[in-house]
Each structure stands twice: as structure tokens, then as C-alpha cells.
């Protein structure tokens, strides 16, 4: 119903102009006839009494055009007349042609009252009016129609509404409508028959309905529901119900919420949405139980501040910890978008008890004997019961070349995620929070990025045997990459450079070197491509210089390194066609050879700011440096041999199978490593790496990789994943193993336990899935098992029953929260188990609104909250 232009005020007017005038003496008899009709219709045909509950709503469903369809989710649909479905967006009533038919005798006058009798039907494209009788009143002076009275089986159809009533009175000046004993069906957007939108449909009944000139509908003694009309699972009744399309909201006074036939809640006033327009108001509450926080209940409040930014405030009460306040601010402009999230606990009683208990176990005598605990205890003493987590993510696109990004994360104490991470939907093991501001340029030949980067490292006293590594800050870091192809025939130019100022602060690890590092690597390549392959010789000059402001013994204040790099990358391509059954395929064979030469230079005097040795991978066969970062450049005189084979569908080129295998043969021993005085490797072979990707059937995929070290007779790393993805049906299982490597990172020197705490194996089995069990049942699950530690790190299970008008979901999540000190001073595993429950009555709140905490914390953890940065 478009504001101020309802068809019912115009369609009859257009057809009455020009009719022959009859005597006005019949006016009194017409009025008497209307009164007589009113007395007869005190027993309503639209809302009959004396019917059973089931028969009554079957009657209402029939009036509103409900068609049973057991195979649909709602077990039926509202069928619209063909003239409505063919014209879902009708034009103004005053401009559309109209046809009026009536089977009985009629009296039409230019002044006074005109009468249309028996099956009166008025049609326009996208509009229909039906009634047993129609009385049209005209102004005696102007001849304009001022009022229309419809009596008996009144039906009003339009593209977003259907109303059935015993009687309707339509006044043109001002434009108002009054309906008696009405049943209504309203929806937004396309009719339900065509499109499923939220709220997909709303219907109800009313003893008295008024639509005023501002397009506001007021219903007296009315009901409202979005369920199927034959047996509504829920409905609300109210003495007064206001549906305002201008504000996109509904208001109910003295509202009773019914589940089936049973009233369960009374609200003196209730505000709810009547379309999918974002509007200020309360969202669906959620509740649950956590083993570390107790029972919790949250009631989110949504504030639609402007079309391009909004705020969600979620007060949450936890029986053990007290009040927890969460807020999410979202903003969007033509060039930028982002979120700001804050989680604040004004007085965490559980954390207060933890601090007091832990501090009592470490008196000065214990600290004197075990000084490793001193920084942990000092930090605990400074912490307060007020706890907070802040996260901000913002991206700006200035134009097609320039952009910026802001990632900010801060937590008041390192135990926040251990205590609340599982309940919030994130990781309880997170110990690195990224903070980064960068500016990027992406042009045709040049790319640039300047950034400020720092991590907040979380140190928990229960992790003293395997502490998190404090990270270097980059204040600032400038990186530039250039590429000019074809500067001459078969000559390409490459360039990359970086300038970084590394800063380091830590209370847990001794001071490390700080200073500036400058790196530059220009190169020239000579690509030659031919029909069955390619060969690309390349020559590079790798230059690195340091200016150390805080250095350790054996390190110089300034130092530099200049080394040449020479490599040859080459490959061949062969293919053949073959048939398997009725299908045609293409198989390729792609051998590849890569030679790399880098002379040796002792680099023990250089600091190690950010360089690590990652597990062996297929990409390392063709890398210029086995290390990531620029603090170490390997010596190399080596040849890589690799073979790739693909099987493609000959019809569309889609991949069926891809297999890779390769290894490196070292002509010289590798002498460069991360730590001074390390033992050089005298192996002639790298691990043998193999990869396989296979799509055996539609929706199925298998990926696997294995790096086997023949020198040590052990697996370097392996991963296997089997996945199924078919729309809403998703499942996968993964296995990941990485063998520990003591030379992968610098070993901290203050640990009182021997060896490198980070050299242990990584060995996990991870499985996840989302699956519709039945037509209305859905299940999701996630499981992460740590084989090395023989424990489940995370598992979660969720089940939802979903209908067209309500949904019920239940979830359980158990998260490993690290180690805690028991009363005897021993370390004990700690788990947090959270239960969640949510009932959604669709049409009374946001459809499927997830708790703010789960959404925002997961987003934050995907944008800067992680485990150790290696």
C-alpha cells in the first residue's frame, strides 16, 4: 500500500463520472438499507463465532488464499490472483484503467448516492476490489465522490496486502478507511508465492481496523502472526495494534504472546519490525551456561543511527562474573567500511578470586627460589577486576590505486581469552594480538606499502614452561616492489626493497637487538617461451644493511651483506587426450627444473628480527631463499627437480586431478642457519615433497601433501583433507602433522626447562560439518583433537529446528583454556564448557540474529588475534 495513493480511494471514482443522473429521493431509503444490513451482520461472516479453534483458523486461511502444500517448509503458501502476480508493481490508481462489473440491478447518480449490487468487482492491473454491495456518496455541490461504503464479503487485493471484511467505509477527504470484522494478510516485496523474504508474511484478524491519511493502520482487538494460518505456532493478540509502514515498525498495546493456544507472556507495550528495514529496537535475547561464567542472559539493543552506520549494545548478566557489556559499531561510506567492538566487565568476581588465590601461592620466598615467576606475579599485582577487550577493523579505498587498513586490538589482561574466549566463540589459546596501520599503493608497475605494526603478547602464568614469544614491533616498515616486463627483447626488470625500524620490549625475555634494517634486491630476468615450455635465467643482487642501536656481544653497531643470486627456472609441457567410459579427458605432464646459486657468507653477526625456517613445502623447491625474512640468505648450489601432472575435463577444462612431486639436490652443504654456532647440514637431499588434489565426484574433494625426509627417515610434515560441499551440506576432516624443528626459530635463553619449548610436534585431527538432518532440522559441529597433547582443544555441536515462523537452536562448546595451578601448586588442564539456547519468533525480532559476541570476536580473531607468530 503506497502512502496516500491506495487504489480503493480512486478505482470506483473513475468509473462513476458521466453516468446518468437518477433521483436523489432514494437517499433516505439507502441509509435505512445500510442500517438494516449492519444489524444483520452483527453475526460476522468473516469472523464467525461458534467454530472450534481448528475450524476457525481453517476458515481464516481459506479467506486469505492459503493453499496447503505439505512439501514446502511452511506446508503451504498464499496464492494470489493472476492479475496481482502479473503486475507485482501496480501504478497509481488514478492513472490505471479500471473495469467495474456488478451482476445485480444498480443505480448510478452524478449527485447523491449510487448503488452497485451483487458481486461487485473492480479490477485494475495489480488491484482488485470485491463486495456484495457498494454505496458511493457524492458531494451535492461539486459532484465529487466523498465516501464509499462496501458491504458483504468485502475483499481488497493489492501487491502487498489482502484484506477480507464484513464492511468497509472509505472516505476520500481525508483519505481514510474503516473496516469491520476483518482478516488481513500483508507482506513486503514480491508476493510470497514468488519470493521468500523476511518477514515473509504477516496475517491476523481485527474487530475494527482504521487506515488513516498517513498510511498508518490501527487495529482494535487484533491478532498478528507470521506462521501458517491453519494452525499458528505463535501469535500475539492486543487490544490495539498499530502497523506503521512509514516507520517500518509495529506497536502492540496490552499484548499477549501465545504459543499455540496458550498465552505465555504479557507485555503492556511491545515494538516489533514489520519488514526487513533496519530499525532501532531490541533484538532476540539469548541465554546459556558456561562452566567458567555460570548462567548468562543477554538482551541486545540495536540502534540504527543512520543509513550508513549503526550500533548494537548488548548488556549480558553472568551469574558468576557479574555484568558484561558489549558494543559493536559498524560504519560504511563510499570509500571506507569497518567495525569497532568493545567488551567490558566492570567487576569480574571470578577474576578477582583467581588473582588473590594465585598471588597467595607465590610469596617472596617462592619467588626467590623460582625467579622465572617474578614477571608473571608483578603483572598480576597490577591487574584490576575491570576487564576489557577492544578491537577495530577499518578499510579505506581512496581510489583504484591507493588504500589503507587499520587493525587495532587491545586487552586489559592476558587471561581474558582464557576465561571468556570459548564463551565468545573464539580461541581460548590466543596469545598474540595484532595492531597495524598501513597505506598501500597498487599501480601498473609499482606497489608500495608503509605500515606501523606491533603485537600485544599475552603471558599467562600457567604457560611458564612454554611461554609466548614477544614480537618485534615495526615502527615503521616501508616496502616497495617494482616490475617492468620487456624493457628490452627478452628482458624483464624486477625490484623490491624494504626499510624497517625494529623495536622490542619485554619483561619476560632478555633484551634483544633493536635497530634498523635496509634491504634491496634488484634483478633482471631473461624469459624465453616456446610452444612446449620455457626457460628463464635470472640474476639478482641482494643487499642488506643494519644499524643496531641496542646490540649484544659479538654484534657490530653497523654491518652489511651483499650477495649475488643466480637461478634458472625451466619447464616443459606435454599433454594427451584419453577416454574413460563416455567422458573425454586431457592429461598433462609438466617436468620442471630449477637451479639456484648463492655464495656463502657468514651471517652470525647479524641479528634475527623476523626470519624463520618453515616446514618444507612444494613452493620451496623454487624459492630464492629457504628462510622467510631478510636476516638470513642461504648459501646455495642446488638443483630442484619437480614433476606436475594434471587431468582435466576435455569439455570444460575443469580440473579432475593435480599431482606434484619434487626434491632438491644439494651440490654443496648448507652452512647458513638461524643461530650462531649451529651445526651445518651435510645432507645432499631435501625432503621429498608430494601433493595431490583430486575431485573424484561432484561436490567431493581430496587434498593431501607429504614431505618425507630421507636423511632422517621421518616425516617433515603432512596434511590430508577430505571435503564435501553441496550447498547447505558441508563436511570435512583434516589431519595435520608438522615435525618439531629446534632450528626453526631462535631459542629463548631464560627458560628453566631444557630445550626449545617450540620444537615439539604439531599433530592435529580437525573435523567440521554443517548438515540438514531432516526437512526442518540442521546440525553443525566442529572438533579439534591435539594428538601430541592427547586432548581435545575445541569441540562444538549445534542443532537447530527451523520453520517458516520460528526456530529453536541449542549449542554446546567445550574449549581448552590452558593450564591452571591447583591448590597443591601443580599444573592442571582447564576447560570451559558453554551451553547456548535461542528461540526465534520470526517477525518479532531480527531473523537469525547471532549473539554479538560470537560474530565480533570471531571477526576480531580472524583479523589480528592469533596464536604464536613464528
Curated annotation (Swiss-Prot):
This is LPS-assembly protein LptD. It comes from Coxiella burnetii (strain RSA 493 / Nine Mile phase I). GO terms for cellular component: cell outer membrane; transporter complex. Residues 1-25 form the signal peptide. It comes from the Bacteria. Together with LptE, is involved in the assembly of lipopolysaccharide (LPS) at the surface of the outer membrane. Coiled coil: none annotated. Belongs to the LptD family. Component of the lipopolysaccharide transport and assembly complex. Interacts with LptE and LptA. It is found in: Cell outer membrane. PANTHER family: LPS-ASSEMBLY PROTEIN, LPS-ASSEMBLY PROTEIN LPTD. GO terms for biological process: Gram-negative-bacterium-type cell outer membrane assembly; lipopolysaccharide transport. Keywords: Cell outer membrane, Membrane, Signal. The keyword Lipoprotein does not apply. Its main location: membrane. InterPro entries: LipoPS_assembly_LptD (IPR020889), LptD (IPR050218), LptD_C (IPR007543).
Amino acid at each position: 500500500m503506497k502512502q496516500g495513493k491506495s487504489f480503493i480511494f480512486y478505482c470506483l471514482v473513475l468509473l462513476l463520472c458521466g453516468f446518468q443522473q437518477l433521483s436523489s429521493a432514494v437517499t433516505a431509503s439507502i441509509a435505512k438499507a445500510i442500517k438494516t444490513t449492519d444489524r444483520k451482520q452483527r453475526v460476522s461472516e468473516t469472523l464467525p463465532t461458534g467454530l472450534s479453534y481448528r475450524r476457525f483458523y481453517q476458515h481464516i486461511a481459506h479467506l486469505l488464499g492459503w493453499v496447503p502444500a505439505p512439501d514446502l517448509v511452511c506446508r503451504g503458501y498464499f496464492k494470489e490472483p493472476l492479475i496481482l502476480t502479473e503486475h507485482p508493481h501496480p501504478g497509481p490508481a488514478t492513472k490505471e484503467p479500471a473495469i467495474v462489473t456488478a451482476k445485480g440491478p444498480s443505480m448510478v447518480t452524478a449527485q447523491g448516492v449510487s448503488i452497485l449490487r451483487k458481486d461487485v468487482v473492480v479490477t485494475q492491473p495489480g488491484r482488485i476490489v470485491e463486495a456484495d454491495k457498494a454505496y458511493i456518496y457524492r458531494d451535492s455541490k461539486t459532484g465529487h465522490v466523498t465516501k464509499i461504503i462496501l458491504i458483504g464479503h468485502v475483499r481488497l487485493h493489492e501487491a502487498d496486502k489482502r484484506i477480507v471484511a464484513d464492511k468497509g467505509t472509505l472516505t476520500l477527504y481525508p483519505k481514510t478507511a474503516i473496516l469491520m470484522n476483518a482478516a488481513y494478510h500483508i507482506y513486503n516485496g514480491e508476493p510470497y508465492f514468488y519470493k521468500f523474504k523476511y518477514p515473509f508474511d504477516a496475517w491476523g484478524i481485527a474487530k475494527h481496523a482504521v487506515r488513516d491519511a498517513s498510511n498508518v493502520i490501527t487495529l482494535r482487538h487484533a491478532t498478528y502472526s507470521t506462521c501458517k494460518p491453519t494452525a499458528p505456532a505463535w501469535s500475539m493478540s492486543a487490544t490495539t495494534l498499530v502497523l506503521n509502514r512509514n516507520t517500518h515498525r509495529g506497536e502492540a498495546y496490552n499484548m499477549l504472546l501465545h504459543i499455540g493456544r496458550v498465552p505465555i507472556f504479557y507485555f503492556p507495550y511491545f515494538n516489533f519490525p514489520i519488514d526487513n528495514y533496519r530499525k532501532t529496537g531490541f533484538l532476540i535475547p539469548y541465554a546459556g551456561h558456561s562452566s567458567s561464567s555460570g548462567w548468562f542472559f543477554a538482551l541486545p539493543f540495536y540502534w540504527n543511527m543512520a543509513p550508513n552506520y549503526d550500533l548494537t549494545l548488548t548488556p549480558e548478566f553472568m551469574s558468576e562474573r557479574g555484568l558484561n557489556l558489549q558494543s559493536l559499531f559498524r560504519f560504511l561510506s563510499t570509500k571506507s567500511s569497518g567495525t569497532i567492538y568493545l567488551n567490558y566487565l566492570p567487576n569480574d568476581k571470578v577474576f578477582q578470586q583467581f588473582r588473590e588465590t594465585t598471588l597467595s601461592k607465590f610469596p617472596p620466598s617462592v619467588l626467590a627460589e623460582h625467579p622465572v615467576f617474578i614477571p608473571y606475579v608483578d603483572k598480576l599485582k597490577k591487574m584490576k577486576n575491570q576487564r576489557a577487550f577492544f578491537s577495530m577493523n577499518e578499510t579505506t579505498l581512496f581510489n583504484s590505486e591507493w588504500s589503507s587498513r587499520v587493525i587495532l586490538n587491545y586487552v586489559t589482561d592476558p587471561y581474558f581469552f582464557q576465561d571468556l574466549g570459548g564463551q565468545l566463540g573464539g580461541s581460548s589459546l590466543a596469545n598474540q594480538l595484532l595492531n597495524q596501520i598501513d597505506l598501500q599503493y597498487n599501480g601498473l608497475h609499482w606497489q608500495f606499502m608503509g605500515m606501523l605494526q606491533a603485537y600485544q603478547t599475552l603471558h599467562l602464568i600457567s604457560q611458564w614452561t612454554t611461554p609466548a614469544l614477544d614480537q618485534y614491533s615495526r615502527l615503521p616498515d616501508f616496502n616497495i616492489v617494482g616490475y617492468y616486463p620487456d624493457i628490452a627483447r627478452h628482458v624483464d626488470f624486477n625490484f623490491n626493497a624494504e626499510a624497517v625500524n625494529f623495536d622490542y620490549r619485554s619483561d619476560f625475555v632478555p633484551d634483544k637487538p633493536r635497530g634498523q634494517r635496509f634491504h634491496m634486491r634488484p634483478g633482471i630476468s631473461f624469459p624465453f617461451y616456446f610452444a612446449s615450455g620455457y626457460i628463464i635465467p635470472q640474476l639478482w643482487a641482494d643487499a642488506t644493511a643494519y644499524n643496531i642501536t641496542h646490540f649484544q656481544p659479538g654484534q657490530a653497531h653497523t654491518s652489511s651483506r651483499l650477495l649475488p643470486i643466480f637461478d634458472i627456472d625451466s619447464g616443459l609441457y606435454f599433454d594427451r587426450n584419453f577416454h574413460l567410459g563416455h567422458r573425454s579427458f586431457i592429461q598433462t605432464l609438466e617436468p620442471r627444473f630449477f637451479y639456484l646459486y648463492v655464495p656463502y657468507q657468514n651471517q652470525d653477526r647479524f641479528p634475527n628480527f623476523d626470519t624463520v625456517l618453515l616446514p618444507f613445502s612444494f613452493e620451496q623447491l623454487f624459492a630464492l631463499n629457504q628462510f622467510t625474512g631478510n636476516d638470513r640468505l642461504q648459501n646455495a648450489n642446488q638443483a630442484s627437480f619437480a614433476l606436475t601432472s594434471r587431468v582435466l575435463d576435455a569439455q570444460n577444462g575443469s580440473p579432475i586431478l593435480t599431482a606434484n612431486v619434487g626434491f632438491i639436490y644439494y651440490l654443496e652443504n648448507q652452512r647458513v642457519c638461524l643461530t650462531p654456532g649451529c651445526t651445518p647440514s651435510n645432507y645432499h637431499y631435501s625432503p621429498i615433497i608430494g601433493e595431490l588434489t583430486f575431485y573424484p565426484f561432484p561436490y567431493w574433494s581430496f587434498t593431501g601433501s607429504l614431505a618425507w625426509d630421507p636423511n632422517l627417515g621421518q616425516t617433515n610434515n603432512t596434511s590430508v583433507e577430505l571435503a564435501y560441499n553441496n550447498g547447505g551440506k558441508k563436511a570435512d576432516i583434516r589431519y595435520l602433522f608438522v615435525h618439531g624443528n629446534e632450528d626453526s626459530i631462535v631459542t629463548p635463553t631464560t627458560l628453566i626447562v631444557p630445550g626449545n619449548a617450540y620444537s615439539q610436534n604439531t599433530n592435529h585431527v580437525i573435523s567440521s560439518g554443517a548438515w540438514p538432518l531432516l526437512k526442518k532440522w540442521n546440525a553443525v559441529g566442529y572438533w579439534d583433537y591435539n594428538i601430541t597433547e592427547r586432548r581435545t582443544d575445541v569441540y562444538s555441536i549445534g542443532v537447530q529446528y527451523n520453520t517458516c515462523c520460528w526456530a529453536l537452536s541449542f549449542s554446546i562448546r567445550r574449549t581448552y583454556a590452558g593450564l591452571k595451578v591447583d591448590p597443591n601448586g601443580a599444573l592442571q588442564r582447564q576447560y570451559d564448557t558453554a551451553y547456548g539456547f535461542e528461540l526465534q519468533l520470526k517477525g518479532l525480532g531480527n531473523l537469525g540474529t547471532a549473539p554479538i559476541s560470537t560474530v565480533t570476536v570471531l571477526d576480531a580473531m580472524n583479523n589480528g588475534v592469533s596464536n604464536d607468530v613464528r
